[in-house]
Amino acid sequence: GSSACFPALRPREIDGVKYIDGGWRDNMPLDLAAAMGAGELLAVDVNGVGITRPNTTGLPTRIIRSHWNLGPTLDFAPERAARNIALGYFDTMRLFDRMGGTAYGILPDSSAFLKNFAERYQLRLAEVAARSPAIDLVEKTARQLANYPAPFAPNPSAPTAAALAPLELAAEHLNVPADMPYTPKLLAATVMGSFEKDPADRFPALLDGKDGSLVAEKAMAAAAPEEFVTALVSRTLADVPLF
């Protein structure tokens, strides 16, 4: 275990045998589980220090990974531990299709909010692209850099993880807490309550066609694509009823 993490901590000795953290051989010993008779594998990748070997077992395998930085190896703060437990729970529920989203724990929701948001977001994005064709690449770059899925083709407004991605990306950019579950509508409302100055105000020429320096705004969007997507999400949510 981590109590034997070498060289940060000394090896542990049990019955005359010294032990160090297993991560120095394999962080996810899937081959060991297979050798012990497992017919299906469920692994957790915490992106920790050590070696993670490729899965060569040939067994059906699911791997739980976190979108978030889980903190330093030796950070034992109770607050971080509680946050990581919540994030791990959401990651597991998402893997088994009990929750949606990519980074946040998105609860099942029968309302039409996500569909309406996705349709309006794509319409807004198309309007901006008509003013600046390169903006599509900016939006896709924001998703890629922040590890969110690309727009779902052939229907980019379908209520999928890809359709939810811009909303999650904006939430992450605005530091919306990830250790609690949200419906899409609640996440949207939390996003809209997370700023004092509307991010969309930085892009009046791009988003609304108002007089301004389109060239400067295009450069700003390219330099900080996550800020542009956050602004576009804000402008989209202004058009979608939340209550």
Predicted regions and their residues:
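Patatin-like phospholipase
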Residues: 1-243
